[in-house]
């Protein structure tokens, strides 16, 4: 099974609140967002994205891959060496619909803050591109470190509050991640 299907889109919940779906290994991927078409990290296999403390989420218009680590990685190889629980590392995000990448990053950030209290930091492992810089800075992250192969941006709760002072009053309701 290569995971190409429209079933993921049909399982999505369209609400004004968060619209997030966890893509499990056995789940079909949205056809128009297939993992092999990842423009950020095309070299990463489906297996890599779903093993060793890693998850994939979608909102139907974007995909984000998250690794749970115990420190801030500087390379993709570090994602294997730093498996842990207290750092959520957004290591690839891409979108085929304008605005959906931003929505997914912010909604997943909020969701993890509310449901995974052990996560202390929300950091990216980003390519060293102007596009990545613009995306993360414009979405409220700060440049944490510049590395040889990557840049790390950090999303902090204080920045989320500036962007949306009432974020903590949101109810998950029908938006529970499946």
Which residues does each predicted region cover?
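Short amphipathic alpha-helix that is part of the acyltransferase structural core
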Residues: 2-47, 173-177
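Conserved acetyl-CoA-binding loop-helix of GNAT-fold acetyltransferases
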Residues: 95-114
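A short helix-loop-beta-strand connector motif used in the catalytic cores of GNAT acetyltransferases and
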Residues: 43-62, 68-70
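Short, high-confidence coil segments that cap the C-terminus of an alpha-helix
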Residues: 85, 117-119
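A cross-taxonomic marker for long C-terminal extensions/tails that follow the last structured domain
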Residues: 152, 157-178
